[in-house]
Regions:
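N-terminal/domain-start alpha-helical segments
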Residues: 1-120
Length: 121
């Protein structure tokens, strides 16, 4: 299964990609929103994991572009816990939301859940 991870903190991106690789996912990593958009436009992904706060295009802007291209499930990663962010994500049809900090095992569990649900569509 091919996953795109868009995370601007290199150490975090490396840790998350390693955990996903160990769980048998093939992971491409983009370190900013513009690179994330290029990956999305040039490849097929079963799931996209987006940090909300990104340089270039932020996670919300990137999510709007993802939805124009199809229904690929999206998992947002953020430190923001405000109701406004949750509502915005719902308006943009996010599929799941994970608050930082979190354990890599929790991320893997959420990814599995989203991919199982998406196969049921």
């Amino acid at each position: 299964m091919r996953v795109l991870l868009v995370e601007d903190e290199p150490e975090t991106a490396e840790l998350l990609a390693k955990g996903l690789n160990e769980a048998s996912y093939s992971v491409d990593v983009a370190l900013n929103g513009m690179d994330g958009r290029r990956f999305i436009e040039s490849g097929e992904y079963e799931l996209i994991i987006l940090d909300v706060m990104l340089p270039g295009l932020n996670g919300w802007q990137l999510q709007q572009q993802i939805r124009k291209l199809g229904e690929t499930p999206v998992l947002f990663l953020t430190t923001k816990d405000g109701i406004e962010d949750r509502l915005r994500g719902l308006e943009l049809h996010e599929d799941d939301y994970l608050l930082k900090p979190f354990a890599v095992s929790e991320l893997v569990a959420r990814v599995r859940k989203l991919l199982r649900r998406d196969r049921g569509r």
